Amino acid sequence: MLLHRNRSYFKIAIIADRQRQMTFFKLEHAKAFYYADFVAYILMIVLVSGLLIGYAPRGEWRHIVLSVAGGLALWPLIEYALHRYVLHRLEPFRGWHMEHHNRPRAFICTPTIFSAGLIFTLVFLPALASGNLWIGTGLTLGVTIGYLAFSWTHHAVHYWRADRAWLGNRKRLHNIHHGSGSACNYGVTTSFWDDVFGTRSG
C-alpha cells in the first residue's frame, strides 16, 4: 500500500513538473504578444544592419555580403532539420509542437527570448570561431532574416488567403504536412530539402 502511494506521488510529481515546464515555455500567447515577435525580429534585423553599415570597415563589405547570403542559404537546411528532427522527434519540443498541430490557428509561437537565444548560441557564437566579427555577424544576420521569412510564411499559410500561386503552393504542402501524420513536407519556406531527402508529398 505504501509502495502504491509512493508511485502515485511520483506520477503526480512528474505531471506537475511537466506542467511547470509548459508554463515556463508558454507557447500560446495573446494576439498582441504573438505579433510582437515579428516586430522584435524586424527591429533586431534593422539594428544589426545599421551597426554593420555604420561600423564595418570598407574592406570587409564583400565578406559581409557573402556571409549574409550564406546565412540566408543556410536557413532552409536549419529550418528543415529543426522541424523534422527536433520538433517531431525530440521531447519536450515534440510535445510543444504537437500543440500547434492540434490547434493550428491558435496563436502559438516560440518565445522570442528563446528563439533569439538559440540563434545567438548556435549561430553567432560558433561563427565567431572564424575569428572575424563581421563575418560572424553577417552570417547571423542572414540566418535571422531567414527565420523571419519562415515565421511570416508559416503565419501566412495558416491565416492568409492564398491568392498568389507561390503562397497557395506553400499552404497546400503545409496542409498535407498537418494532415498526413506529419511525416512529410517539413520545409515551410521551400521544399528544396524535402526534395533532397525524399520527404516531399503532393
Give the positions of each predicted feature.
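Interfacial helix-loop-helix junctions of multi-pass membrane proteins
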Residues: 157-170
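Non-catalytic, topology-defining segments of multipass membrane proteins
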Residues: 1-147, 152, 163, 180-202
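Low-complexity, intrinsically disordered Gly/Pro/Thr-rich segments
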Residues: 174-179
